[in-house]
Amino acid sequence: MANNMFDFHNEVHLRGKIFDIVEKKYYTDFFLSCGNNGREYRFKKRNGQYSRDTINVRFFKTEAKTYPKQFKIGDRVTVTAVLQNIVDRHTQRGKYLEVWGLNMMSVADDKAKDLNNVQYRGRIVSAKAINDNYIIINVKTVIKKKIKNTRENTKFPFIEKEFVSSTATGMRFPNGGAKDLVYTRYTPGTWVDMTGTVQGRKNAKTGKHTQRFVAEKVNIIGEVQKIDLRNQKI
């Protein structure tokens, strides 16, 4: 975790089974089947089995070339990654969540439980009440991670890369009052610390894989910024 409560933080920890590997020219996608202990995991399918998340972790550069040789479908692995919401470059509308992989290791302990955990800390960029029971907040982080240097004959085996992420998450308020909270609590500039899971599903209509960040806990850090949100958009 970050040392200071006002330090940005963006970290994803996954443990699950590889069920598909898709190699492209510049990246490789590893699809993981992960169970988790979040609220969404309580829901069962009609056959009585717990629903599992399918998460697409994308690796670039050296890892994109070497990992397909090291890991195969059916392997249980542990992954460290970061989150980032991407805007469709063609329409400039509709955001989708990417999970950028940093490293992946085999799971030595067969009894190790699946893991799906996100720790995310940053400033609220915008907030919007969908109705009086549900709001969406957009939170920005700027972090630096050490990654392998792929250049040959270098004195520096690792380099620092900056990840700028603006990630959206929804929050439910069964007792109502969400429309007031975007003006009084979840305001732009306010720091929040969030923990949750990555929820991934295959869209039944389009056949495409979609995923989102589901926050289980959202804590305000420091003071709530008093800003008028009437013209804010996500």
Stretches found by the model and what they are:
Residues 2-234:
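Single-stranded nucleic acid-binding surfaces, predominantly the OB-fold ssDNA-binding core
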